[in-house]
Amino acid sequence: MSPYISPLFSITMIMSVMLISSSGHWVFMWLGLELGTLAFIPILVWWHSSLEVEATVKYFIVQAMAAAVFFLGGMVSLSGDFMGGVNQLMGNIGDMMIMLAVVTKLGLAPFHYWVVDVVQGLNYIPGAVLLTWQKVPGLAVLTQLATCNNSSMLLLFGMVSALVGGLGGLGQTQMRKLLAFSSISHLGWLVVGCVAGSLLGLSYFTLYVILSIPLFSILHMLNGGHLNQLRTGLMFNPLMSVLLGVGFLSLGGLPPFFGFFGKWLLLTHFVGQLLLGVSVVLITGTLISLFYYLRVSYLCIVVLGPQQIMSGLNWRKMQLSGLMSGLLVLNMLGLFLVGGASCLPK
């Protein structure tokens, strides 16, 4: 692929988000979603492997079906304006169809099955884009839908996704599938954050991107598709093992790591709104998902001790690069951020 084509697709994906965010009509939302999808498909097959082609076809089929439901829901809602007494009913049906279409595009439970299969067939780089940036257009639409009468349904989707993401990753040894279920769990928190307020949702999404992109980059460099392959690669990269282990603990939201701060923000909001049931379900899903985060971190930090390192370098005398040092310090800032936010005036 020409080096000039990739920036074109990236700019198109950014423009799709701007189109959705600046418009309040379902037609422009639909156009923005499809513009981002079509621009992302060439990035999926960047390395031209058969697995990537298969994953791209699955992704296209799901997105096309969801787009058709979205457009049909918009037409149903529009037809209600010309049908007198059933206006409200048709409008509600149309809004529900639009919401279900966006939920399917995002991969929220129970419409999450395609996410795991697609991510498993992708390289880590397009997989990272799929699980981070490609969520932005759908979340922008859901943020606008949350102002309607669909907030309770979105809360339900978010809670179910948090639980499914935790339970689905328990028996996984494939790193891509594990990251896919992790994304589903975090997506549940993101949707709940969008219902709570766009600023809370944006804050949580920013934290998730900051934490997940370095993990995808390290796994891409190590080319670790399986836990056993990851262990072999980490035996020659002791500093990577520390960074990866701490990164997974932070992604799981374990205090005092950076990922704990995002979950704390949402939980304090819902406890303040007396939505204790939502808080309990989200915490339960996080505690379940912490099991596989701890398993990977245990493999990286504890199992691969200094005596097992085969890099030929001294474990204790090796120096961290500036990037690694920054990421390690950032991951340890969770409790400091919580303490600072607690001191702010209410």
UniProtKB/Swiss-Prot annotation:
Domain of life of the organism encoding this protein: Eukaryota
GO molecular function, one term: NADH dehydrogenase (ubiquinone) activity
EC number(s) on file: 7.1.1.2
Catalytic reaction list: a ubiquinone + NADH + 5 H(+)(in) = a ubiquinol + NAD(+) + 4 H(+)(out)
Cellular compartment(s): Mitochondrion inner membrane
UniProt entry keywords in alphabetical sequence: Electron transport, Membrane, Mitochondrion, Mitochondrion inner membrane, NAD, Respiratory chain, Translocase, Transmembrane, Transmembrane helix, Transport, Ubiquinone
Membrane-spanning parts: 1-21, 26-46, 60-80, 96-116, 122-142, 151-171, 178-198, 199-219, 242-262, 274-294, 320-340
InterPro entries from the UniProt entry: Complex_I_Subunit_2 (IPR050175), NADH_UbQ_OxRdtase_chain2 (IPR003917), ND/Mrp_TM (IPR001750)
A GO-annotated cellular component: mitochondrial inner membrane
Lipid bilayer topology: Multi-pass membrane protein
GO BP field: mitochondrial electron transport, NADH to ubiquinone
One Pfam family this sequence matches: Proton_antipo_M
EC class name: translocase
Function: Core subunit of the mitochondrial membrane respiratory chain NADH dehydrogenase (Complex I) that is believed to belong to the minimal assembly required for catalysis. Complex I functions in the transfer of electrons from NADH to the respiratory chain. The immediate electron acceptor for the enzyme is believed to be ubiquinone.
Family: Belongs to the complex I subunit 2 family.
Name the UniProt record assigns to this protein: NADH-ubiquinone oxidoreductase chain 2
UniProt source species: Branchiostoma lanceolatum
UniProt lineage: Eukaryota, Metazoa, Chordata, Cephalochordata, Leptocardii
Gene designation: ND2
